[in-house]
A protein has these predicted regions:
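Alpha-helical tetratricopeptide repeat
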Residues: 2-197
Length: 197
């Protein structure tokens, strides 16, 4: 199943913190290291970016943006245990961060830890009931576990939230096909093709 990955390098780590006008108590060294990490990530120098984000985290262990950005890079470099560790630390800092649960779920799914992934997507949805990507990702993990009925429920909810996303129809079509529901699969594939034009 194709992933719709909110992390997938729309370079969602382009969060910059200005070194100017920082609130009192902010570690300026951590801010500088973070900004250098963003700069290196923008140049696609990911190993250097990780090094700077790691420095920012060393100087400020609760630097949520550095943890987030480093976790994204680890995910995209297929270093999933490290990505899971960063997203787990991020959840420890902000247990209401629905994106961190979704992102950790993706890292679990890439390791074929689908039960853990589903638990994280479920938490993300609990925190943000309109989180289309989390429904889609949970559907992908349910599909991987051959829980086709659950996958259909999640893809259908995702389609309700974003009826213009061809990928969602294609995912549901593959699931209908796996269930032997060829007519429903064909209908969804046709809708997906129309939307993809």
């Amino acid at each position: 199943m194709k992933k719709v990955f909110g992390l997938s390098f729309a370079l969602s780590f382009l969060i910059t913190l200005s070194a100017f006008a920082q609130p009192p108590g902010v570690n300026k060294g951590a801010v500088e290291a973070f900004n250098k990490g963003v700069s290196e990530a923008n140049k696609r120098n990911f190993k250097e970016a990780i090094s700077f984000y790691s420095k920012a985290i060393e100087l400020d262990p609760k630097h949520a943006n550095a943890l987030h950005n480093r976790g994204i890079i680890y995910y995209n470099m297929r270093s999933q245990p490290e990505a899971v560790a960063d997203f787990t630390a991020l959840i420890g800092i902000n247990p209401k961060d629905h994106d961190a649960y979704n992102e950790r779920g993706l890292a679990y799914a890439d390791q074929k830890k689908f039960a853990e992934a589903i638990a994280d997507y479920t938490k993300a949805i609990e925190l943000n009931p309109s989180y289309t990507a989390a429904y889609n990702h949970r559907g992908n993990s349910a599909f991987a576990m051959k829980n086709y009925t659950d996958a259909i429920i999640d893809y259908t909810k995702a389609i309700e939230l974003d009826p213009a996303d061809a990928n969602l129809f294609n995912n549901r079509a593959k699931t209908f096909k796996a269930m032997g529901k060829d007519k429903e699969a064909e209908d969804d594939l046709a809708k997906g093709k129309r939307l993809a034009k």
